[in-house]
């Protein structure tokens, strides 16, 4: 692993240097070779295990925790920072550099009286969701590995510590900019320093001047809108959309009590700490804009207000455009021109179908997958049998067929639907079963689940049971932020 230290060397006021404590009896629990290839690691090794567990120094590593602030559940927290994540530096690879971070490596100056550790269950969940989202083609940070230990840690009860090795194209968050705006820490000079660094590292085609700043913020708005459109189309609820959990690159970031939808429910809440549903599934598009507005506020000392507002006004446009692209793919709809009238018609058609799904309490993923078995030219649809409200479905299906038109190659059309409507997602109960098995010393369910998630659009008949609706105990599991 070849490391460079651009952030560490160029932004000394944006972090504190801190070294990992190490863990006892480190051992590999999970490994992603896909992620390893990004930074040219051929295979796991004992030497790498000792380095990534914090028990030995990694050549070229600087070890630091970044500082930032953020809006958490709508309220501003003036100092947050990496409370249990220690970054080694940026590892070089064929697709560019990736930050390497040890999540759960011990306390930092930003731990806020915490122990700086991560428990095994949260480490495994982050690993699995990183694999799942990547293979669903949704922008995300990656997880290289989970390292287990026999180190006890206390949450609600005694658990075992683990480390997630996270890879990110950048760890810069909306909250980094907020930290240097809402303080006496040298803004706007520090804001400009951070923004220029971000542009040079990740948007090298842009200039570090007023024109480049506006173009950059416009891209951040568009990338954030696309990320959230992906979430809404696939049925993913992040759970903790605080501004310190928002990547400046539009990557899904900082996983806690996330969930995929089981039964479709617009108001689904996956976070036990969010009883009012601020971050409910259906609220995510609006929260995305709210967070971008907080970022714009932080940038206002160095970017003209008119430029910020103009870029923010593109959020809804980009969100709808990308959402329609994804949902038309799921339904097999073609469009030759992006006319507003057609867009409005298709949004109404999509909304009518998701409304039917909710009223009939249908499984989100399985219902969309059924389009791969549908004969779109037939007057009677096998999909109809899933609905209790037959009249509602018939009315919708008639409108759908009119919009769809005649399909010449039904087999090809069905195959295309199966390439965008996954058969398998990371259901919370599947993750929980894998975690329980790990606690009992059995890694096979975890590794099988990882293999399943690497090919979510394939039939994988040996894992057929994992596509079924959850058992009663696993339906709509709500997780806590405890990790």
Swiss-Prot record:
Binding locations of Mg(2+): 245, 254
Known catalytic reactions: L-seryl-[protein] + ATP = 3-O-(5'-adenylyl)-L-seryl-[protein] + diphosphate; L-threonyl-[protein] + ATP = 3-O-(5'-adenylyl)-L-threonyl-[protein] + diphosphate; L-tyrosyl-[protein] + ATP = O-(5'-adenylyl)-L-tyrosyl-[protein] + diphosphate; L-histidyl-[protein] + UTP = N(tele)-(5'-uridylyl)-L-histidyl-[protein] + diphosphate
Record's keyword annotation contains Hydrolase: no
Residues binding ATP: 81, 83-84, 103, 115-116, 166, 173, 254
Pfam family, one: SelO
Task of the protein: Nucleotidyltransferase involved in the post-translational modification of proteins. It can catalyze the addition of adenosine monophosphate (AMP) or uridine monophosphate (UMP) to a protein, resulting in modifications known as AMPylation and UMPylation.
Family per record: Belongs to the SELO family.
The protein's name in its UniProt record: Protein nucleotidyltransferase YdiU
């Amino acid at each position: 692993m070849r490391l460079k230290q651009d952030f560490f060397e160029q932004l000394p006021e944006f972090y504190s240097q801190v070294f990992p404590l190490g863990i006892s009896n480190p051992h590999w629990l999970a490994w992603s070779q896909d992620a390893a290839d990004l930074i040219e690691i051929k295979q796991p090794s004992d030497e790498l295990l000792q380095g990534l567990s914090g028990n030995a120094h990694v050549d070229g590593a600087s070890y630091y925790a970044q500082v930032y602030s953020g809006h958490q559940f709508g309220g501003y927290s003036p100092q947050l920072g990496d409370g249990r994540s220690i970054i080694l530096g940026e590892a070089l690879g064929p697709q560019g550099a990736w930050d390497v971070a040890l999540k759960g490596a011990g306390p930092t100056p930003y731990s806020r009286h915490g122990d700086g550790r991560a428990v095994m269950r949260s480490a495994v969940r982050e690993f699995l969701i990183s694999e799942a989202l990547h293979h669903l083609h949704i922008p995300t940070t990656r997880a290289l590995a989970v390292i287990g230990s026999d180190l006890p840690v206390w949450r609600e009860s005694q658990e075992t510590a683990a480390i997630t090795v996270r890879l990110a194209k950048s760890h810069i968050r909306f909250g980094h900019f907020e930290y240097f705006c809402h303080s006496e820490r040298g803004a706007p000079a520090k804001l400009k320093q951070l923004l220029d660094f971000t542009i040079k590292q990740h948007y090298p085609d842009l200039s570090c001047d007023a024109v480049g700043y506006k173009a950059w913020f416009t891209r951040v708005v568009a990338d954030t809108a696309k990320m959230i459109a992906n979430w809404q189309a696939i049925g993913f609820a992040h759970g903790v959309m605080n501004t310190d959990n928002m990547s400046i690159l539009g990557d899904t970031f900082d996983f806690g009590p996330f969930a995929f939808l089981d039964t479709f429910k617009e108001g689904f809440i996956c976070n036990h700490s969010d009883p009012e549903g601020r971050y409910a599934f259906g609220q995510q598009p609006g929260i995305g804009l709210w967070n971008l507005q907080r970022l714009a506020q932080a940038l206002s000392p160095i970017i003209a207000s008119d430029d910020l507002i103009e870029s923010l006004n593109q959020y809804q446009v980009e969100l709808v455009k990308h959402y329609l692209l994804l949902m038309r793919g799921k339904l097999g709809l073609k469009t030759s021109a992006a006319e507003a009238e057609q867009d409005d018609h298709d949004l109404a058609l999509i909304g009518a179908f998701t409304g039917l799904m909710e009223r009939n309490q249908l499984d989100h993923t399985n219902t969309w997958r059924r389009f791969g078995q549908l004969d779109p030219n037939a007057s009677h649809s096998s999909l109809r049998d899933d609905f209790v409200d037959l009249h509602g479905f018939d009315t919708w299906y008639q409108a759908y067929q009119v919009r769809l038109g005649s399909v010449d190659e039904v087999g090809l059309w069905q195959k295309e639907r199966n390439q965008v409507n996954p058969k398998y997602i990371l259901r919370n109960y599947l993750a929980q079963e894998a975690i329980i098995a790990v606690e009992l010393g059995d890694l096979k369910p975890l590794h099988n689940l990882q293999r399943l998630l690497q090919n979510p659009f394939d039939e994988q008949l040996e894992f057929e049971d994992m596509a079924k609706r959850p058992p009663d105990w696993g339906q709509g599991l709500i997780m806590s932020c405890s990790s």
